Amino acid sequence: MSYFTQEQKTQWKDNGFVHLKGFLNEALAQDIKDWTQELYEWEEAPGKWMKYFETSSDTGERLLCRVENFIDYHKGIKGFLCGEMIYGMVSELMGEQAVLFKEKINFKYPGGAGFAYHQDAPAFTSFGQKYHITMMVSVDASNEENGCLRMAHGFSEEKTLEQEPDGTVCKKLAAKLDWRPLETGPGDLVLFNSYVPHYSEANTSDRSRRAMFITYNRLSEGEKRLDYFKDKREKFPPEAERIEGKDYSSAESLYNLGNPIK
């Protein structure tokens, strides 16, 4: 049994990503919206889930940018992200058994900043793994106005591009890529490998652009999720765990690549 049509397999082969429109049924899409709101309402909790913030470009207020490391504290989300269907889909694309590497939700509220041109691989491969697949779950509708994902089309090579000093894709190279907006609806899934260049613009609308970004790796390359979050908590902790006056900028190319988090 395959989870993908031949057309979707071709899209994956040619571009390194595939867009599954309306994949989740209405009930599950609503559950994901409800769960995302629950995580938004959770208080900051040092040593548990990790909340990161940004500053609104519109009002200057503190906005929740993302939450990470939450599946151990939410049964519903864990059941979905680590269930037979999702593992089966990702494993099919990988050609072997997949395992969860890390999980996050980007909230991108009105006034939220964009994410610079980047590939995920340079940050992910630091844990001794060569290949990852990220699944974006569209919580809200996303379009150009609220900062949808923009993907480089026709990039099927598994190679790391030349980078700027901050780890983002070299601007001269980025200018040559075929960038296209990828608009989504609630319940859409987008799966992409860790070498596909992507970015997004700021949210200039009055609506949120919430999305889950769930990353998996090959089981044969090890289960590194706990190692990842342990290292991130030490080197680039959430605001609630930071030591006043300590400089965390040295870890930004690994843990804040192309991101608006300060």
From Swiss-Prot:
It catalyses: (2-aminoethyl)phosphonate + 2-oxoglutarate + O2 = (1R)-(2-amino-1-hydroxyethyl)phosphonate + succinate + CO2. Involved in the degradation of the organophosphonate 2-aminoethylphosphonic acid (2-AEP). Catalyzes the hydroxylation of 2-aminoethylphosphonic acid to yield (2-amino-1-hydroxyethyl)phosphonic acid. Binds 1 Fe(2+) ion. Keywords: Dioxygenase, Iron, Metal-binding, Oxidoreductase. PANTHER family: ECTOINE DIOXYGENASE (PTHR20883:SF48), PHYTANOYL-COA DIOXYGENASE DOMAIN CONTAINING 1 (PTHR20883). It holds the Pfam family PhyH. It comes from Uncultured bacterium HF130_AEPn_1. Its cofactor is Fe(2+). Belongs to the PhyH family. Activity is enhanced by ascorbate. This is 2-aminoethylphosphonate dioxygenase. Its EC number is 1.14.11.46.
